[in-house]
Design a protein with these regions (language model features):
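ADP-ribose/adenylate-binding Rossmann-like module
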Residues: 80-98
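Rossmann-fold NAD(P)-binding glycine/threonine-rich loop
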Residues: 92-114
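Rossmann-fold cofactor-recognition segment
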Residues: 42-54
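Hydrophobic/small residue at the entry helix of a nucleotide-binding pocket
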Residues: 10-12
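N-terminal Rossmann-like NAD(P) cofactor-binding module of classical short-chain dehydrogenase/reductase
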Residues: 63-68, 89-90
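C-terminal catalytic/substrate-binding lobe primarily of soluble NAD(P)-dependent oxidoreductases
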Residues: 133-249
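NAD(P)-binding Rossmann-fold cofactor-contacting core
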Residues: 26-40
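Conserved N-terminal Rossmann-fold NAD(P)-binding element of oxidoreductases
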Residues: 3-8
Length: 249
């Protein structure tokens, strides 16, 4: 079994280092070998130039492909993994084209796993835990008015001009700003094409409270069902959003 780790960008290195340090057989693929060597070369010498044909030729049944490349590569890599009888992992949102591979993956007996980062990923676990705890509490009543907010964002220690800590490809951050969002505000669906049209203020309940700018991220609505919301609930607010330092907008 070999782990084929594709991409050595900003968010790749901690997980990649850990796998290598734990002794797992890892082959690193990157579009620029020199950049990968600079980032991870002290941990492994098995670094290869990323090329779809080369990756496909190297895949064997039981291998795992981890895609930390830009989103356009996820589906082609997942298809290649399924065809080879290998598993696939990414931290990105599940695109419709990725979801369409579900049955093929099941028939091949392999796992195709996405949304396993911080957001999306760990936030899903926390949301499921929160909803389950609410359902099991004495406060639960199907007639209650329910509000759910989940915010995540990279915050620099010292404010920079972009008011954001880049932990993944800057071009990806900018492209995300072009995605429309849908959420629930005051019991009504709110759809905006530009995030800055739905900015609000959020005070984080920290030991020393701090206020941030927040805005809805993508389409929040499907996550109500995924998190176990009862269709009968009166949802006053449901937002999965992005957090930024004040002054971002």
């Amino acid at each position: 079994m070999t782990i084929h780790w594709c991409g050595t960008g900003l968010s790749s290195i901690p997980g990649l280092k850990r796998l290598i340090q734990l002794g797992y057989p890892v082959t690193v693929w990157n579009r620029t070998v020199a950049k990968a060597e600079a980032a991870i070369g002290s941990y492994t010498t098995d670094i290869r130039a990323f090329d779809m044909a080369a990756v496909q030729a190297s895949l064997q049944a039981g291998d795992t492909v981890v895609s930390m490349l830009p989103g356009d590569w996820h589906v082609p890599l997942a298809k290649a993994a399924i065809e080879a009888g290998a598993h696939f992992v990414s931290s990105s949102y599940i695109a419709p084209e990725m979801r369409a591979l579900d049955q093929k993956a099941k028939e091949a007996g392999v796992a195709v796993i996405n949304e396993v980062g911080l957001d999306p990923g760990i936030d899903h676990l926390m949301a499921h835990h929160l909803v389950a705890a609410y359902r099991g509490s004495n406060a639960y009543d199907v007639a209650n008015r329910v509000s759910f907010t989940s915010y995540c964002g990279g915050v620099p220690k010292h404010p920079n001009p972009f008011r954001y800590k880049f932990s993944w490809a800057p071009v990806g951050v900018l492209k995300a700003l072009k995605s429309p969002s849908t959420s629930v505000r005051a019991g009504e669906e709110l759809t905006v094409t530009k995030p800055w049209d739905a900015i609000s203020s959020y005070t984080a309940p920290l030991p020393q409270p701090e206020t941030f700018e927040v805005y809805p991220n993508r389409d929040s609505l499907p996550f109500m069902a995924e998190y176990g919301f009862d269709p009968r609930w009166q949802v006053h607010e449901f937002v999965r959003g992005t957090l930024r330092l004040n002054g971002w907008a």
